Amino acid sequence: MKSLKGTKTAENLMKSFAGECQARTRYTYFSSTARKEGYVQISNIFLETAENEKEHAKRFYKFLKDDLQGEAVEINAAYPVELPTDTLTNLKFAAEGEHDELSNLYPSFADVADEEGFPEVAAAFRMIAKAETAHYNRFMKLAKNIEEGKVFKKDEVVLWKCGNCGFIWEGAEAPLKCPACLHPQAYFEVFKETY
């Protein structure tokens, strides 16, 4: 790959690295809020997504490290300030950020990388935008579940799994506490085997 030094692509990679690092940290904050509010599954999803963001940051940083080791890349960018409020607000805020990355930021950064002759970087931006699409969709579904009171209650009978002990409960609603380990309803999530 040719040198990134002095290119707009290098700036975009560093902006993306910084943005992904900040998203990761915000998601860990949001995870704590969700857990405190009794949404253990949503807390875990925020942590999982935070780890995904770390890997995105790593991918962007590796392009820079491989070519610009020991140098500084100056950027001028704005990043949102959103301290955790409540889980519903945090999910909507997170979805908004993911949507901006998948629909505006990363497609435009991919186009610049293509124009500057960095097809591998362009491909990375496009593939990571696809991952951000999954994050966006997941956050929106979780927000809708909270809004509709369907985190622990469904319209039909489903299997619920206690995230603490693995107990499986069948019903339209998760039990208020696990009959096996006595952990609260917060630990239940819809159970579906995907293997």
UniProtKB/Swiss-Prot annotation:
It is found in: Cytoplasm. CDD domains: rubredoxin_SM (cd00729), Rubrerythrin (cd01041). Fe(3+) 1 binds at residues 20, 53, 101, 132. GO terms for cellular component: cytoplasm. GO terms for molecular function: iron ion binding; oxidoreductase activity. Keywords: Cytoplasm, Electron transport, Iron, Metal-binding, Transport. Residues 157-195 form the Rubredoxin-like domain. Signal peptide: none annotated. Fe(3+) 2 binds at residues 53, 98, 132, 135. Binds 3 Fe(3+) ions per subunit. It comes from the Bacteria. Residues 1-150 form the Ferritin-like diiron domain. The keyword Iron applies. Fe(3+) 3 binds at residues 162, 165, 178, 181. Its main location: cytoplasm. Its cofactor is Fe(3+). May provide oxidative stress protection via catalytic reduction of intracellular hydrogen peroxide. Homodimer. Possesses two rubredoxin-like centers and two non-sulfur oxo-bridged di-iron centers per dimer. This is Rubrerythrin. It comes from Clostridium perfringens (strain 13 / Type A).
